[in-house]
UniProtKB/Swiss-Prot annotation:
Part of the 50S ribosomal subunit. Belongs to the universal ribosomal protein uL6 family. One of its GO terms (molecular function) is structural constituent of ribosome. SUPFAM superfamilies: Ribosomal protein L6 (SSF56053). This is Large ribosomal subunit protein uL6. It comes from Methanobrevibacter smithii (strain ATCC 35061 / DSM 861 / OCM 144 / PS). InterPro entries: Ribosomal_uL6-like, Ribosomal_uL6-like_a/b-dom_sf, Ribosomal_uL6_a/b-dom, Ribosomal_uL6_arc, Ribosomal_uL6_CS2. Keywords: Ribonucleoprotein, Ribosomal protein, RNA-binding, rRNA-binding. Pfam families: Ribosomal_L6 (PF00347). The keyword Aminoacyl-tRNA synthetase does not apply. PROSITE patterns: RIBOSOMAL_L6_2. GO terms for cellular component: cytosolic large ribosomal subunit. One of its GO terms (biological process) is cytoplasmic translation.
Length: 178
């Protein structure tokens, strides 16, 4: 089996975005803010060459090749986050008991879910911001993982156990990603 001597991937840095690389910690600054992340995989070298982020590895194994792709995706998501940001839209669905959703600092409180007396809570992760307008919930942020995990926390908080999901369709569901 022939093995490539090296793998090299490049990510172009757009106008108005600054990338700082310091000991495998990548910091991306852009018009929407700043995001940083430490990449600790030993066989992947991260450098900046002529307005490009370059990821390299020598004599790669399967895991090294996979980590190059993963690291490239993470850095691309960081660049997208500081330029455009991420926005997820969710819909509050209820049939009989009108639930109310409120945001208190870094916790989303769901009252009267299926007529329950105790409120359910969902954690807002990291730099994500949650806005509730009527029956729409909008989650925005520059870090894709924080926005996605906050969305998952909201969905899990309204998960119904022990009842037929075809009948009890109440909850907060994802309707679109931007």
């Amino acid at each position: 089996m022939v093995v490539a001597a090296a793998i090299r991937e490049e990510i172009e840095i757009p106008e108005g975005v600054e990338v700082i690389i310091n000991n495998n910690e990548v910091t991306v600054k852009g018009p929407n803010g700043e995001d940083s992340r430490k990449f600790t995989y030993p066989n992947v070298d991260i450098t900046e060459v002529e307005n490009n982020v370059v990821l390299e590895t020598s004599f790669p194994r399967k895991k090294d090749k996979a980590m190059i792709g993963t690291t490239k995706a993470h850095i691309s998501n960081m660049i997208t986050g500081v330029t455009d940001g991420f926005e997820y839209h969710m819909k509050i669905v209820f049939a009989h008991f009108p639930m109310t959703v409120k945001v208190n600092k870094d916790v989303v409180v769901i009252d009267n879910f299926l007529g329950e007396r105790h409120p359910r809570t969902a954690k807002v992760v990291g730099s994500a911001k949650v806005v509730v307008k009527g029956d729409e919930v909008t989650i925005t942020g520059i870090n894709k993982e924080h926005v996605g995990q906050t969305m998952a926390n909201l969905e899990q908080a309204t998960k119904i156990k022990g009842r037929d999901p075809r009948v009890f369709q109440d909850g907060i569901y994802l309707i679109s990603k931007e």
